[in-house]
Amino acid sequence: MTRHARNCTAGAVYTYNEKKRDAAESGYGTNAQRLGKDSVKSFDCCSLTLQPCRRPVITKDGYLFDKEAILQYIVTKKNEYSRRLKEYERLRRAEEDKLSQEANSKQQARMERFVNAEKPAMTPAHSSAAASEKPSTSSAAAAASSESSSASSISNMTNGHEKKLPSFWLPSECPNAGLAKAQKPDATIYCPVSQKPLRVKDLIDVKFTLLKDGDTKRSLIAKEARYMCPITHDVLSNAVPCAVLRPTGDVVTMECVERLIRKDMIHPLTDRKLKEKDIIPLQRGGTGYATTNDHLQAKEKRPMLQA
């Protein structure tokens, strides 16, 4: 009986299983993982802190945040923009100084070439007389210049070369290494979830209606069913699609929106006229089903191995 199971490593095809195993062990390539129910926040939790919101606010795209957390995020992004703007100004000034120095050096070189071209040429008789007057000096100078040129061509510690590193493999010593190109930073603050422009005045206060269950012993966070629809009194959960009414911030179920509100487009609590943009669907929490949430795959970018 041959040992086929022991000789299964000599295949001519690089299988999918081998690729996945090698990618996991080598540390290269992008890692992807399917998110389960425990990895997705609840519908009433902040998208930044992943904790139940104390002062909930919602964006126009339906992402819920704690007001303190999202304001702190906006302040941090503004401070980061100020820091990047200062760095941009510094790089721009350095680039302007470099360009002015190059222009000055080119102008100086042109002036020197012009002056040298305008100098009168020496006659042959004058040049021979000058050479006959000091033959020893010219020969000594020629010998000294030849020695200095030979020394400079051999040694790397003369004529200022001792300050230059011979480490050609360093990024700063590469031929194309230089000052970073100045790029003006973007002043727009983007939503940390949807990556769309975010402004403080676009945040809408959300008002959850507490569920009247009569249980006063447990805290609100310890309860699984915490809120209800103020119109139908249905319990709100991750499996129940909800929407926020912009004028008052009340959270109602989508079933209530479709059956009661969309008929007349009137707010059932205040009798105010509603528009389509006043109904903001709330992003749902994790239920464990693939059709509930849009983004259920987490990716970790790692270095790519190129052959």
Curated annotation (Swiss-Prot):
Residues 120-159 are annotated as: Disordered. CDD domains: RING-Ubox1_NOSIP, RING-Ubox2_NOSIP. Pfam families: zf-NOSIP. It comes from the Eukaryota. Its main location: cytoplasm. The keyword Cytoplasm applies. Keywords: Cytoplasm, Nucleus. GO terms for biological process: mRNA splicing, via spliceosome; negative regulation of catalytic activity; negative regulation of nitric-oxide synthase activity. It is found in: Cytoplasm; Nucleus. Residues 127-155 have a biased composition (Low complexity). Negatively regulates nitric oxide production by inducing nitric oxide synthase translocation to actin cytoskeleton and inhibiting its enzymatic activity. This is Nitric oxide synthase-interacting protein homolog.
